[in-house]
Amino acid sequence: MNALSEHILSELRRLLSEMSDGGSVGPSVYDTAQALRFHGNVTGRQDAYAWLIAQQQADGGWGSADFPLFRHAPTWAALLALQRADPLPGAADAVQTATRFLQRQPDPYAHAVPEDAPIGAELILPQFCGEAASLLGGVAFPRHPALLPLRQACLVKLGAVAMLPSGHPLLHSWEAWGTSPTTACPDDDGSIGISPAATAAWRAQAVTRGSTPQVGRADAYLQMASRATRSGIEGVFPNVWPINVFEPCWSLYTLHLAGLFAHPALAEAVRVIVAQLDARLGVHGLGPALHFAADADDTAVALCVLHLAGRDPAVDALRHFEIGELFVTFPGERNASVSTNIHALHALRLLGKPAAGASAYVEANRNPHGLWDNEKWHVSWLYPTAHAVAALAQGKPQWRDERALAALLQAQRDDGGWGAGRGSTFEETAYALFALHVMDGSEEATGRRRIAQVVARALEWMLARHAAHGLPQTPLWIGKELYCPTRVVRVAELAGLWLALRWGRRVLAEGAGAAP
């Protein structure tokens, strides 16, 4: 077991040292399909089309059947991409089964917009409906009526602006509203809104206008973004890229949750990332990428990380996202984010600042079991729950929450793991362990023994599934569809396994009468 712990630390060190390449994000059905639609040449992208067809589920849709709300955008996009690729093997059949799938699916936007709707749904889905109606007339597709007024209001707002500033959040969905390349300009990485789909759409329009230098920058960006998926297939893209602030911030924050932030084996890799974050954090905060708009979520996590590293960051960068008692992720946000306020609370507590409003909001957003499950950036309740427990317990050594603890223990599956879908996942099991790690500290001996038994079962499940340098495959993060920020998830998996191993050693030591 000690050898495994060393291997874990070695892999973590390698992952941290690789974080200067813009980030690693798994492949996206939505962005790949959109890029294929805008590429024009079907025969030049046969491998990408084959990959797209291979991702279709048995029921005809794309995306996980466990989380139906996030299947519409990838299914619409794939359907529209494949209906123009009829000669390719499997394309016609895929279109037929996708059409039947969309006809059968209940419309989640028939009457209202769910709190955890995918990014850009109000712009993207009505656009797809219109395109499908003109291409596949006579088919009774869902119409998503609750999104129409939101799209119209957004288009009116956009119509009043000649060009959005680089990095504006709405550029991330440019493919759904951009009608001229003059309404956007590639950022310093060559992207439109850190979105391969938006960039591919913009590039297709710019080519017809002869904007050669900027088209070259967009091409270079798309090549780099495709490489970030590690799929090895030209024309397969991630849902978002780069993530050169989000990836290092969340990775170091995760190390803290596992008690690994200050581990000597990781010290140099952590120091390099902290120095970069410190240099990048300005008065306006940070966004998920260097050339994207600042938001409260990335800013709050960056403040946490910098404070944990012994820096003294100014809280002002976070305060200007505060509206009344809440923190908005970014100005004009459709609905407040629970995890953004959890991270703001954690940052304020670490920095010793008043946080009554954020604390009250986090407490008020529990479900009846005392957990947090109404999150808009991650589909699993285990993600906000782990972070909320850490934030609420910060600076309060005697903090206890028996209701949340009981619910967390009860949610462990028979196989020893945790998961919000039909099966356990390594990532979600790690989040459960991070929460239990905090809760264990204030428990009496009986409670600690009970937690230790649960952790032992989790460790057994993790050991049976651990592979060195494995690539996480399960998309649980909410973008335009569910996606997987590969390194962020891998750091969580490894940190969770390391924590469970250390827990097991401590329990053995305590059983032998030694000090923990």
From Swiss-Prot:
Source superkingdom: Bacteria
InterPro entries: Terpene_synthase-like, Terpenoid_cyclase/PrenylTrfase
BP-aspect Gene Ontology terms: terpenoid biosynthetic process
UniProt GO molecular function: terpene synthase activity
PFTB repeat ranges per the UniProt record: 45-86, 401-443
Keywords assigned: Repeat
Name used for this protein in its record: Uncharacterized protein blr2149
